Amino acid sequence: MSIYETAQQLAQQIKESDEYRDFIVAKELMKADEGHYKMIRDFQMKQFEIQQAQLFQLDISQGKQQELERLYSLLSLNPAAREYLEAEFRISRMINDVQKIIGEAIIDVLPLGFEDNDQPQILA
């Protein structure tokens, strides 16, 4: 079996997984409720902004962090929104685990220095 066939099998297994199916169902439920869908999108945008700031080692205002926490608290009161966030976490964790397994298998083909967990310096 070729590596491409194996990758296709992996993609199919991901689509057949409980994590994937649960996420798709939760996503469709969220899309059906425009108000909660907008809140989820707002939460995700704020979360992304904070993650980007952390990636570039920028200061994150306490207000932004508190706003994200407040929005998360509001979302978790709604069962459909809470289920969506939990399903999103589970599918993300599965994908990250698969990426980690592949990454560990190909460490020998990484550019010089990266195999020692050296990180390139980010210039801000």
From Swiss-Prot:
Task: Please report which protein family the annotation says this sequence is part of.
Answer: Belongs to the UPF0342 family.
> Know the name of this protein?
UPF0342 protein DSY2926
The organism's taxonomy opens as: Bacteria, Bacillati, Bacillota, Clostridia, Eubacteriales
A Pfam family (short name) is Com_YlbF
Q: Which InterPro entries match?
A: Com_YlbF, YheA/YmcA-like_dom_sf
SUPFAM superfamilies, sorted: YheA/YmcA-like
